[in-house]
Design a protein with these regions (language model features):
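ATP-dependent carboxylate-amine ligase
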Residues: 1-168
Length: 168
């Protein structure tokens, strides 16, 4: 038997009559590429791989457009959102990510700075057979904003969004 991955690493939610949502801590270009490549075979024929992610503030700004390019190249749709903006402007962080997406010519992307709304929108728009990867925070139970740790759980938001989906 296979051991379950640790919380926040390839953590699966939904599937079956709902889209499969995978939460992963991937927060570097290499890690994001690996999780998207790993999940591509799970996408049903004719369905889509969706990537929801953001980049942390007060961290390497050079990786932001690179991560945008990785997501745009490997996912069918991309939703750019916040991660832990810390003391940086969330819109500026997302703008740097978006620059990388735009450079690829990918047109199927959107920007939603409210992480819960971004995750919910991606889950609600997804169909059975789609795979939604929610990357960047994984097991974290908070979001760091302006020196404050606010309670936040990707898993809770994903489960609430899946529970609130209309039947396919």
């Amino acid at each position: 038997s296979r051991a379950a991955p640790p919380p926040g690493r390839m953590e699966r939610h939904g599937g079956g009559m709902s889209p499969l949502v995978v939460i992963d801590y991937a927060h570097t270009p290499d890690a994001l590429e690996k999780v998207l490549v790993a999940m591509r075979p799970a996408v049903a024929d004719g369905r889509e791989l969706v990537c929801v992610f953001g980049c942390g503030g007060d961290r390497d700004p050079g990786k932001r457009p690179v991560m945008g390019r990785v997501a745009a190249r490997l996912a069918d749709r991309v939703v750019v959102t916040t991660d832990n903006p810390r003391f940086e402007d969330p819109a500026a962080i997302a703008g740097a990510v978006a620059k990388g997406i735009v450079e690829t010519g990918q047109r199927r992307w959107l920007l939603e700075l409210d992480r819960a709304a971004a995750i919910a929108a991606a889950v609600h728009a997804a169909k059975p057979g789609d795979v939604v990867v929610v990357a960047g925070k994984g097991h974290e139970t908070y979001q760091e904003v302006a020196g404050e740790r606010r309670p936040f759980s990707d898993a809770r938001v994903v489960d609430e969004a899946l529970a609130g989906r209309s039947p396919a």
